[in-house]
Amino acid sequence: MTLLGTALRPAATRVMLLGAGELGKEVAIECQRLGIEVIAVDRYPDAPAMHVAHRSHVINMLDGEALRHVITEEKPHYIVPEIEAIATDTLRELEDEGLNVVPCARATQLTMNREGIRRLAAEELGLPTSTYRFADSEASFHDAVAAVGFPCIVKPVMSSSGKGQSFIRSAEQLAQAWEYAQQGGRAGAGRVIVEGVVKFDFEITLLTVSAVDGVHFCAPVGHRQQDGDYRESWQPQQMSELALKRAQEIARHVVLALGGHGLFGVELFVCGDEVIFSEVSPRPHDTGMVTLISQDLSEFALHVRAFLGMPIGAIRQYGPAASAVILPQLTSQNVTFDDVHAAVGAGVQVRLFGKPEIDGTRRLGVALATGENVEEAVIRAKKAASRVTVKG
């Protein structure tokens, strides 16, 4: 039984978002639809989810004392992390004290860095993964690369959107790759993972929901990555029945091992009928923004429904659909979007995130489109995204 209070009243149900980016914004909107009181927290002011929250706070979320202070002040019923860079030890303490962390503090802690989740998947669950080694010094990094072999990929154990990630083909790149990885970590310099390159036909995100009525799967989401970040995603990604079954088995093992209720973005490599585990996020995934147009319940609606303790029932997928990011490069604290009218149309939508500034390249929006098939949907989404002119 789920009891919900009314926002801004004494019996309000309060949700605190730790991270207030575009994904958190959609979670906030879904909470608002249920009359939930929303508090958005991020490291910078005027973040997207703050625009649709009842209150907001700006803190360093890696500072456990600051995190505990804002949670004690607001007394949320649900704490919903949207990013990895959070003082997860504090979240575990707060959960032990009776607070509800979504999906659970253990899942947040294990997935905040690539080492925790890789060791869980490969060493505890025995799932197929790429070869890997960890390193915490330049010397051990060289040893790790020698063990894995060329080509390989190096990533900070804690980073996102491709930051600090390098593809290494030869020994001449090692010094630069190490330095870049040290600059790209979300919590500063530190430990890295060196991964062998996996042969695959395509990558998918399997959006997996753990809820009171069991584990549910969205249709697989295909995506194209560039510079460590996604450019387009589409649903459904065609794959063999056997590969889909194996993907679902892997995803089920991972989310049940992590625990808690919510939506998880399980990233997998697919080569023929073979499926290899890559990563998992215990929250909505950026490639899953396509579900804003492709499903009756978006990944954000599913996440909220699951962590509130509601049953999912069934997930209806409408047919071929795609998303394409709006990714300008400029410097401005007063961004405007021109020609939006030329981007939208029948079966084509645009979402602008409302980020307060840009300094370089930054994802500021996404175009969504349907089509007769996935290829057409991708073309329509990319065309719509290209028609939006970003100015500063």
UniProtKB/Swiss-Prot annotation:
InterPro entries to which the protein is assigned, alphabetical: ATP-grasp, ATP-grasp_carboxylate-amine, ATP_grasp_subdomain_1, PreATP-grasp_dom_sf, PurT, PurT/PurK_preATP-grasp, PurT_C, Rudment_hybrid_motif
Family matches, as SUPFAM superfamilies: Glutathione synthetase ATP-binding domain-like (SSF56059), PreATP-grasp domain (SSF52440), Rudiment single hybrid motif (SSF51246)
Ranges of residues in domain ATP-grasp: 119-308
Binding positions (N(1)-(5-phospho-beta-D-ribosyl)glycinamide): E22, L23, E82, D286, K355, R362, R363
Binding of Mg(2+), residues: E267, E279
Gene3D superfamilies on file: 3.40.50.20, ATP-grasp fold, A domain (3.30.1490.20), ATP-grasp fold, B domain (3.30.470.20)
Spans through the membrane: none
GO cellular component entries: cytosol
Superkingdom in the source lineage: Bacteria
Keywords assigned by UniProt, alphabetized: ATP-binding, Ligase, Magnesium, Metal-binding, Nucleotide-binding, Purine biosynthesis
GO biological process entries: 'de novo' IMP biosynthetic process
UniProt function note: Involved in the de novo purine biosynthesis. Catalyzes the transfer of formate to 5-phospho-ribosyl-glycinamide (GAR), producing 5-phospho-ribosyl-N-formylglycinamide (FGAR). Formate is provided by PurU via hydrolysis of 10-formyl-tetrahydrofolate.
Protein name per its UniProtKB record: Formate-dependent phosphoribosylglycinamide formyltransferase
